């Protein structure tokens, strides 16, 4: 859609975000997990979603690999495609936040500008940047998908951390040590959500 198309207008609906949040008994936010491949983003996000589900929190997890099977299946890994990938995910996450959900996203999202773009789209107070900080050597040793091995062999180009830059967050809402136990990291995230009055259980 062209931004200047005067025939396309925004429709307001009678049920508000606040009413949806009252229905869910918690606030709608996005927790944006970022870090290198193999840092533990998806693992921690999945464990957190499981913990939140047990507490009765309405959640949805958007995973970097999964969205490329559908929503972003037409995109590659050029800088332009990566930016569009994050833009689309940001729009979907924003809709889910407006539905009153706690949205968890697990994406490398290597560039600060793109993460800032999503933050501005979702809005301050509803965007929580989660930096899963795991040393490259540890990520490479884990290499669950064998991607680092391929990148080192020259079989995979533009791989973040090897021949493509990762811009670490400078002021994430929470900075996790990716070498700690997953259970410890989940507890840190639950504590943050409670301290910020996002969940009450």
Swiss-Prot record:
Its EC number is 2.7.1.25. One of its GO terms (molecular function) is ATP binding. ATP binds at residues 35-42. Pathway: Sulfur metabolism; hydrogen sulfide biosynthesis; sulfite from sulfate: step 2/3. It catalyses: adenosine 5'-phosphosulfate + ATP = 3'-phosphoadenylyl sulfate + ADP + H(+). The keyword Kinase applies. It is an enzyme of class 2 (transferase). GO terms for biological process: hydrogen sulfide biosynthetic process; sulfate assimilation. Keywords: ATP-binding, Kinase, Nucleotide-binding, Phosphoprotein, Transferase. The keyword Kinase applies. The active site is at residue 109. It comes from the Bacteria. Belongs to the APS kinase family. Catalyzes the synthesis of activated sulfate. This is Adenylyl-sulfate kinase. The gene is cysC.
């Amino acid at each position: 859609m062209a931004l200047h198309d005067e025939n396309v207008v925004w429709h307001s609906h009678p049920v508000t975000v606040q009413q949806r949040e009252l229905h869910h008994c918690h606030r709608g936010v996005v927790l944006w997990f970022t870090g290198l491949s193999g840092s533990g983003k998806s693992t921690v996000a999945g464990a957190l979603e499981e913990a939140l589900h047990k507490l009765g929190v309405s959640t949805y997890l958007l995973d970097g690999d999964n969205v490329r099977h559908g929503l972003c299946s037409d995109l590659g890994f050029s800088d332009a495609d990566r930016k569009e990938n994050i833009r689309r995910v940001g729009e979907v996450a924003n809709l889910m936040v407006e539905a009153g959900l706690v949205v968890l996203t697990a994406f490398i999202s290597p560039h600060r500008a793109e993460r800032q773009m999503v933050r501005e789209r979702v809005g301050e107070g509803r965007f929580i940047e989660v930096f899963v900080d795991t040393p490259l050597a540890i990520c490479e040793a884990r290499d669950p998908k064998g991607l680092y091995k391929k990148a080192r062999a020259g079989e995979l180009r533009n791989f973040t951390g090897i021949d493509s830059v990762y811009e670490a967050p400078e002021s994430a809402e929470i900075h996790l040590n990716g070498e700690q136990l997953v259970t410890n990291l989940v507890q840190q995230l639950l504590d943050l959500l409670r301290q910020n009055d996002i969940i009450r259980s």
